[in-house]
C-alpha cells in the first residue's frame, strides 16, 4: 500500500482539514495536499514529524503494516 492514502485516513480520523494539519506541521497547504495525493514524495523528516503527531509508527505510515502502533524511540 502506498503511504498517501494513510496520510488522508489519519487526518480524517482526527477530523482535521488539510489546512489545519499543514498549519500544525508548518508547511504550505498545497505542499501537504501534494503529499497526501501522491504528487510529491514525502520527505523522511516530515514523515517522522507526522508519525509523532499521530503517535503511529513509520512502518504504518509507509504501508509496511496495517497495525497502528505507537511510535517508538
What are these regions (language model features)?
Residues 1-13:
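A short, Lys/Arg-rich alpha-helix, primarily the initiator
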Amino acid at each position: 500500500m502506498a503511504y498517501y492514502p494513510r496520510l488522508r485516513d489519519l487526518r480524517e480520523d482526527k477530523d482535521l482539514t488539510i489546512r489545519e494539519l499543514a498549519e500544525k506541521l508548518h508547511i504550505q497547504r498545497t505542499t501537504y495536499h501534494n503529499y497526501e495525493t501522491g504528487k510529491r514524495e514525502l520527505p523522511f523528516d516530515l514523515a517522522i514529524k507526522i508519525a509523532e503527531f499521530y503517535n503511529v509508527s513509520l512502518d504504518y505510515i509507509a504501508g509496511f503494516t496495517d497495525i497502528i502502533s505507537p511510535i517508538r524511540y
